[in-house]
Amino acid sequence: MGVTCVSQVPLAEGKSVQQTVEILTRKLEQLGAEKQGTFYVDCETYHTAGASMGTPGQAGKLLYVMHNSEYPLSTFALFENGPCLVADLNLDVLMVKLKGFFQNAKANKMETRGTRYQYCDFLVKIGTVTVGQSGRGITVEVDYCPCAVPGDCWNLMMEFMQSFMGSHAPSVPPVFSAKHDPLYTPADTMVQYMELLNKIRKQQVTVAGMR
């Protein structure tokens, strides 16, 4: 586990989601990156009822329960603007038993799946975001494996991302500056995915509202 940056890449002009993914993967392969299997990250949204939590009249909060194929024995639970809980897979069973407090918004389940690439000390994952069977966007995750302190390797990561993302290379993730502990953790990656998937979800809602 190194330092990870998760970002969204817009569709290339006149291209579909799949065609844009192919453009990105072609650039990676031209650099010399090699395929290293596949990956997925999923995110289920749960609503908390204010009344059931002992606060009548208060709007419910959102809880995101997430999984990452890099950590197959773990489940991540994140509150909006809150802490990230890392648990084992029994948390999924517990959520079913807590349905009186947390209601699963099944229509809002999102996931990103794609191919992993290895390039020197970098691991790159390019994924297609889907809701149901509908493609909604593209995620790019870049891991710099030898380092665990974001401030020590960000410039190198940025230079590498620009080599295949061009002007779409991201700025410093907010989670880096929000950390109290200088060491990067898997929870920081899940926070980035949660924020990005929410952003993509809201983009779709906005587009639908304009039609």
From Swiss-Prot:
Component of the Mediator complex. GO terms for biological process: regulation of transcription by RNA polymerase II. It comes from the Eukaryota. Its main location: nucleus. Belongs to the Mediator complex subunit 20 family. This is Mediator of RNA polymerase II transcription subunit 20. The keyword Transmembrane helix does not apply. Component of the Mediator complex, a coactivator involved in the regulated transcription of nearly all RNA polymerase II-dependent genes. Mediator functions as a bridge to convey information from gene-specific regulatory proteins to the basal RNA polymerase II transcription machinery. Mediator is recruited to promoters by direct interactions with regulatory proteins and serves as a scaffold for the assembly of a functional preinitiation complex with RNA polymerase II and the general transcription factors. InterPro entries: Mediator_Med20. It comes from Xenopus laevis. It is found in: Nucleus. GO terms for cellular component: mediator complex. One of its GO terms (molecular function) is transcription coactivator activity. Keywords: Activator, Nucleus, Transcription, Transcription regulation. It holds the Pfam family Med20.
